[in-house]
Amino acid sequence: MKIKSDYSNEPQWKEVNVKSSLPKELACLDEIAHNLWYGWTHEARSLFTHLDEELYEKVGHNPVLLLEQLSYDRKEAIVKDKDLMKRVKNVYKMFKDYMNVKPNAKRPSVAYFCMEFGLNQVLKIYSGGLGMLAGDYLKEASDSNVDLCAVGFLYRYGYFRQSLSMDGQQIAKYDAQIFNSLPIERVLDADGNQMVVDVPYTNYMVHALVWQVNVGRIKLYLLDTDNDMNSEFDRPITHALYGGDWENRIKQEILLGIGGILTLKKLGIKKDIYHCNEGHAALCNLQRLCDYVEQGLTFNQAMELVRASSLYTVHTPVPAGHDYFDEALFNKYMSGYPEKLGISWDEFIGMGRTNPDDHSERFCMSTFACNTSQEINGVSRLHGWVSQKMFAPLWKGYFPEENHVGYVTNGVHLPTWTATEWRKVYAANFDDNFMSDQSNENIWHAIYNVPDEEIWNTRMALKNKLIKYIRDKFTQQWLRNQGDPAKVVSILEKINPNALMIGFCRRFATYKRAHLLFTDLERLEKIVNNPERPVLFFFSGKAHPADGAGQGLIKRIFEISQMPQFLGKIIFLEDYDMELARCLVSGVDIWMNTPTRPLEASGTSGEKAEMNGVVNLSVLDGWWVEGYRKGAGWALPEKRTYQNQEYQDKLDAATIYSLLENEITPLFFNKTKGKTYSADWVKVVKNSIATIAPHYTMKRQLDDYYSKFYDKQAERSAKLHANDNRLAKEIALWKETVAERWDSINVIDSNFDALNNAVTGKVTTLTFTIDEQGLQDAVGLELVVLNNTPVDDVNIHKVLPFKLVKTEGNLYTFQLDFDASDAGAFKCAVRMYPKNSLLPHRQDFAYVKWLN
């Protein structure tokens, strides 16, 4: 027998998790480490630091890794250290006292779905503002003690880490997360195995492992497809945030929406409200429709129940920012659902189209979310108005300002983003109930009682803290990128805490106009190099790997930062993450934001700055439209002067230069006699904290969601579900009847032409007699009066309802006494609409007939 040179079978690897053992006295630390409460609790973070400060830095402030890597000798030393053990017991008591508070049963329960969550820098399942907002929301839900759970993804690679080449080119690096070293837990089934959710895709299943993140009292469930049960084509579904092609995107959104609901069902969780944070999660409503139909309800009855309990929050201000799928791709994965729902394919795909009968139109997740959610909201007052216009084509019988799209302005989680130094100032000077009453401006006004010197010293301490962080973290990166050690030393020497320090840190999308400051380099050079009034700019942020223009902006800023006149004055900090963000929003003097109007949906980084006495300089867009107060920051005008964007950019740049030269730097450097600081600047800081900060906390945002949406939706949903869904069935039947007869409803008689003789001071009585075709008072009439402006600039003058004055069989007579109080040219038309007190708003059943 010939001996082979190689002979081996394949090993069957078994995953074995060997945990580092802790002495029983320290076992409680593992419990704290696996709850992100530690991340917004100073006492817990400080405790982990003191266990082994050098190691805690080395593991990136990851307490799970810290406990794993603590040496045996160090563990023994901790147990013997009475003072340290006393701190361990005190922090654990704080934690247990916090966790033992029961949720407020009076407030509706919520299931919250989002593609990303920014909870801390250790758990890399976020990319930008959407994730930051969602993470802060869960933390505040915990602090506010509400009954909420959330669903997202456990990304193997998360969002990329950023570095810059020597010429400033962005390099994206994807590091695999080692799940066992993260502050997360496996969700176990009844047999003690990790729970698996089987998610149906056309003709096959995707198997998702379920993980749990403890966010204080809140549970966040994360789905993970990177396992051996799935094919090589499906394992990458949860590899990267916003990674892959459109096919991977639809697979992600099926997993989040449909898989998310199946996960909650398997866990036995049912909530009052289902909140889709962006359109990515819209298919959760599809699975809920299927569940109700499976229980024996018709599609229309199921839709009443799903809509009543669904809220969709949009974060995107332009239609191009939403997800659209070609019909062929959508059909590939969703072809089985019409049969499950008892409707046709055209009816099904039509729910994701603005024009359902247009077969060339792609399926839009945001449109589907609108059509399956009772309520919709933008994320600032301005963005609410932008969203009304954006979604107006869905309800063609109504003008944008008439539709039901509302808003809740974003806020930020105060304990996460407020530096410890400021929290001490607030604790010493504000009321004891401050944290439970964060929106009370009267409490914040106590900042005026804090001595100016204490305010200034707090600011200087945080500026120096930022500079130390930069020197510690970035020196090696700069040596690598810039080659010349002398240049790096020069940069470090020029970072002066006494300079006016300005931050511009955010996602590098072109609409955010990071280039604006560099429109006139000569003028900028004079500003940053004024020996009496030195100014320093910090830039940081990532561009999407597919966004060449955004990467070009980063490269250009880096190139400018290397010019001799800007060296150490314009500084780009790589790999913007939560840790760096916390240092910047508390460590600079001014937070600058220059988006193209009105493309900033909200923007929360400036709100974080407000909590830390950092003053905003921003275009009046997003949250700053509401937040700006004179004497508490600076604003560029909300209205555009030029339609030509290049001209507008030049004007805005000139405005920024002028503000810096003539207002901001003189104010900052005008030291009060006998002081080392400007009392006038401190006054601006105090005004900012007292009058702006109270209105932009996550506490206020959460309370707004309850008062504006959750409470009323939960109340209505409960009524629809009562008595075997009686009201839901009643409303569905009524809508079906109205829809069936709508086209046959007609005008028998009217005197609409009497409007031709309308004059001011005289009442004109209009009368319409309608044959309702046996519907029994199911329609309403109103006169819509528009100001006579160009067709593309609709401006409602007034809307006047008709009164029902006579009923005779199927004939209903409506009357309106029209008092023409204003002279001028107007456009008038009569609108007929379905009328039912059980409807939450008109767009819930947006049938309209103009009685021309």
Give the residues covered by each predicted segment.
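Catalytic cores of carbohydrate-active enzymes across secretory and cytosolic contexts
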Residues: 1-852
